[in-house]
Amino acid sequence: MTSAQIIIVVTIVLYLVAMVLVGVYFGKKGSGSSSDDFYLGGRKMGPVVTAMSAEASDMSSYLLMGLPGLAYLFGLPEVTWTTIGLAIGTYLNWLIVARRLRRYSAKLGAITIPDFFARRFGDKKHLLSCIAAVVILIFFIPYTASGFKAIGTLFNSLFGVEYHTAMIVGGIVVVLYTVMGGFMAVSFTDLIQSIFMTIALIVIVCFGVQQAGGLDTVIDNARALPGYLNMTQGYDAATGTASTYSALSIVSTLAWGLGYFGMPHILLRFMAIREEKELNQSRRIATIWVVISMFIAVFIGVIGNSVTAAGKVPFLATSAESETIIIKLADLMSQHGVLLAIMAGIILSGILAATMSTADSQLLAAASSVSQDLMQHSFGIKMNQRTTMLAARATVICIAIIGMVLAWDPNSSVFRVVSFAWAGFGAAFGPVMLFSLFWKRANKQGALAGMITGGAVVFIWKYLIAPMGGAWAIYELLPAFLAACIAIVIVSLATPAPEKAVTDTFDEICSK
């Protein structure tokens, strides 16, 4: 191991130890002593922590690996339309969902998304919360797996550390601080990790431009690739020619933004903020950070292509390889002295941060679904506070293990795995969330129909319809989201109206 690699390893180890210490600190403070504290931090989150925790948990490894990799290999169309959709979705989620969800969930005493659905629609049998919990498990496990895959890829490509060993060690660190400190530990580590992610993005752009030969060289190189900068074409790296990116593809790619309305680990942040009025400040902070971060991430992919053209980084021919471009640039940086080696360590810690900040939130949301919604509400298992916390922590560990098993293949694509899980949550929960907050006539039968329809169409479209090609080959979130909305409306109108107590609560919430 070279001296530069030793410096990087020391930097990363210090970072990982710091994350565990945060978990220890909040564990001793009692932040994980009750279910309300463990899952929502006692609804005491400030606006800055709420904003950055929400967006750090949103911007998983696809920010520092998926987006740059996509831009590196195929040019701007898909990745740019995706980021535009995500930026719009982020803003609208904070603007129209956050305030009413915070108010509604506090009124009902709900501490998880499945619990909110059950209480909102007066589902005393908890069928809604049971189905919602199952949906969370189905889609969060592969989502978490993509994060563990990113950790393994980082250490394997940089140090030659065996992929599976690196993945397991990284997973253990995430599990440790999550089970010890709960929501508060997760949220404050997310804040710290968002800072590392920001530093990583800025530094790697500056270094990459310098290595490519300047900004003009980067732009000239991109222009020389057919369709690379064209928003309606795209670049085919396999043939070196331009490809077509149709209007239908643009619309379906913009549909990424719809996913935000159904992301449990993001929606929980809205429920946890200290004061409803502080959401305005959180919205501004979150939106600005997301827009700037995604723009820089895409630009890193373009820069990386130019650094490859300059002969300083080998060509990364596959999706899995192209997602390591930021790792390759950090490795190149580490070869330019001690100071830059330390910065490379910080950048790679930023990649870990992007992964860990999402994985911890997903593990926590999945744990709450199992211990609260499935075990207690659906199955009627009586548990005291201590047993509830033990069940939650055991669930975190079990889900992490399953996620590692699914991530065992080092050749899977982070971006593709995340896109499928994103579609699943967006279609299964997004329409139900919007109708629950804004349509009084929506009932539990309609919500159940929408949830099942959305989740099912994601699978059907991706594996049966999209392979037909042509106009059918669109992102599965768009048709699944629309199908879920239609199902909610039709079934709600075809079945009895909600009980008076349910509609009275809706009127009370909406009147404020």
Predicted features by range, described:
Residues 1-512:
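Membrane-embedded helix-loop-helix hairpins and adjacent transmembrane boundary segments
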